[in-house]
Amino acid sequence: MHNPTPRTESPSALAFIKRFFAAEAAGGLILMAAALAALIVANSPLADSYFAALHTVLAGMSVEHWINDGLMAIFFMLVGLEIKREMLAGQLASWSQRALPGFAALGGMVVPALIYVAFNWGQPDTIGGWAIPAATDIAFALGVLSLLGKRVPLSLKIFLSALAILDDLGAVLIIALFYTSDLSIPMLLAALGSIAVLVALNRLSVKKLLPYLIVGALLWFFMLQSGIHATLAGVALALCIPLGKPDEEASSPLLHLEEKLHPWVAFAVVPVFGFANAGVSLSGITVDKLLDPVPLGVALGLLIGKQVGIFALAALAIRAGLARLPDGSNWGQLYGVAALCGIGFTMSLFIGALAFPGAPELVDEVKVGVLIGSVLSALLGVVVLRRFGARG
């Protein structure tokens, strides 16, 4: 009897897999697939099992809370590492480099929030969601941008990355200042003590990551119990991890941790979050429902507010001589990138869950608004960039 030899991947197939996971678009594409899968499952016979699994309690918290409070702390730690690296040695290391993405990020947070507030003014139950459309999903946006290939100059990708870093910094500050529940003073003091230990480790030039990670885990627990959102522990930990000197890049604790975390966050943490949070039943969604203040404010905040706010303030900074267009780009491409920034998936859904705790119907409305606004923003951005990329 013939025994077939075990199947092995061909060199070309392995090369393709490596290229796929190395591509900028890969993380965004996997997140898109996870979100689509969640929508399909939530509107299939498996819906009851899907929602029951998310609400299963493990060690005192539901699976959904473990994902949003636990796994997302790892996401926020990577965000913190990227912010610190870019501020100290990257695309945001000088004021001149910060000018264009800084003005753009400011406009991209303020105008969407104002649009949401305009639709929800006088609605005490929903006005608290004003920050939902103020966020940009860097994985989605860069994923879509990368699919356009050489139509988009590298300088625009760098601009989008820098803008998203500042956008994330703004979102972190918003969460810390506006979405903090009743505080437990003893746990808050314990959290502050943990941060003091992390700062001391940094000042003592401790290079090993293990002490930071142990204290960081304690910080996460104390923040979880204190009333401050536990994910902010990831940011605080990241900001205390040393970058090192420019000539010590190979031994940099920050760069080493960022390199190790990035694939886990891109290909595991964020897709799991997307699958757990994008699932919404569309059976009760009508045109009237879509015109409710929350989904309308979120969708238009992302679709209109992002592109108007980013492009207007970026143009103002350029015209005033405070910044200049990214090298090799044109005004049309800048507008296309501004439109892409209306993709607000991960952070928008995250803030939506914080804004409306205990109100699942409002969270579902947020999901619908985020999905509509993000998809339309992606389509608009692609159309504009294809139109102006050929000429740019």
UniProtKB/Swiss-Prot annotation:
Q: Which reaction does it catalyse?
A: Na(+)(in) + 2 H(+)(out) = Na(+)(out) + 2 H(+)(in)
Look up the domain of life of the source.
Bacteria
NCBIfam families in the record:
NhaA, PRK09560.1, PRK09561.1
Q: Membrane topology per the record?
A: Multi-pass membrane protein
Q: Which InterPro entries match?
A: Na/H_antiporter_dom_sf, NhaA
Q: Which HAMAP family match?
A: NhaA (MF_01844)
Q: What is this protein identified as?
A: Na(+)/H(+) antiporter NhaA 2
Q: Which GO terms describe its molecular function?
A: sodium:proton antiporter activity
Per the UniProt entry, what are the Gene Ontology biological process annotations, in alphabetical order? regulation of pH
Family membership, please give it: Belongs to the NhaA Na(+)/H(+) (TC 2.A.33) antiporter family.
* Coiled-coil residues: none
The role this protein plays is: Na(+)/H(+) antiporter that extrudes sodium in exchange for external protons.
- Tell me the keywords, alphabetical order: Antiport, Cell inner membrane, Cell membrane, Ion transport, Membrane, Sodium, Sodium transport, Transmembrane, Transmembrane helix, Transport
- GO CC entries: plasma membrane
PANTHER family from the UniProt entry:
NA(+)_H(+) ANTIPORTER NHAA (PTHR30341:SF0), SODIUM ION/PROTON ANTIPORTER NHAA-RELATED (PTHR30341)
Q: Where are the transmembrane segments?
A: 20-40, 63-83, 99-119, 127-147, 158-178, 181-201, 209-229, 265-285, 298-318, 336-356, 365-385
One Pfam entry name: Na_H_antiport_1
Q: Kindly list the places in or outside the cell where this protein is found, as annotated in its UniProt entry.
A: Cell inner membrane
Read off the lineage from the record: Bacteria, Pseudomonadati, Pseudomonadota, Gammaproteobacteria, Pseudomonadales
